[in-house]
Amino acid sequence: MPIHPTAIVDPSARIDDTAVIGPFCVIGADVSIGAHTGLKAHVYVEGPTTIGEENIIYPYTTVGVAPQDLKYHGERAETRIGSRNKIREFVTIHRGTTGGGMVTTIGDENLLMAYSHIAHDVHLGSHCVLANGVTLAGHVIIGDWAVIGAFTGIHQFCRIGKHSMVGGYSVITQDVMPFSTTVSKRDNSVFGANSTGLERRGFDPIAIEHLQNALRLLTRAKLNTSQAIERIEAEIPATPEIADLLAFIQSSERGVVK
């Protein structure tokens, strides 16, 4: 277990023998770090926090610190990070709160670029990319394979659907539909299916075409959401992707970006 002599590690921390703790890192009590995970330097981790295997965490990242929530009064909440994530410089990841299940979670194989912020009770899936300066407010849920462009802000309690792409500098205050591409400055607009991303992930071209047609009905046909759903159910084959899209929309509490 290579731990740099300048690192400070609480005796209760559970660190795998193959993990690497770099210079000037601080590892607090009740922290677990899995095999082959590396903390480069100046990384600060508070517990209760679990970090899985083969993660790389870059300098000046903070993990598991208290949330920026005035209702938080020191309750025992935790942070869970999966495996094979790359967490770049100055990323901030906050623990959960009583209002959100007491846990913040990050899945596997994500890339969190510099200065990204993961607030309390966020649930980030797997294979996601958060570009520089992305800010996820409390209770945000990000589906697998989502890509969020630089300096985008996501309002609390919003959901970003799986396989979606959000353009840089966007301000997202409603749910973003799965499989879609959304770009905004202040007024958000959906520009259709995330065709390029779906092709790269091996989706069938016919399935992508059905998604494109469904999103066109939702965003460009001058229909309200209920009318668009009726048209989709009547006119477009009920593929698994279409079922996921409709289930996401029908479960939205904030409305969806159109």
Each language-model region and where it sits:
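Structural signal for interior beta-strand "rungs" in well-ordered beta-sheet cores
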Residues: P2-D187
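Terminal amphipathic alpha-helical/low-complexity segments used for targeting or macromolecular assembly
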Residues: M1-T6, P11-S12, D17-T18, E54, ...
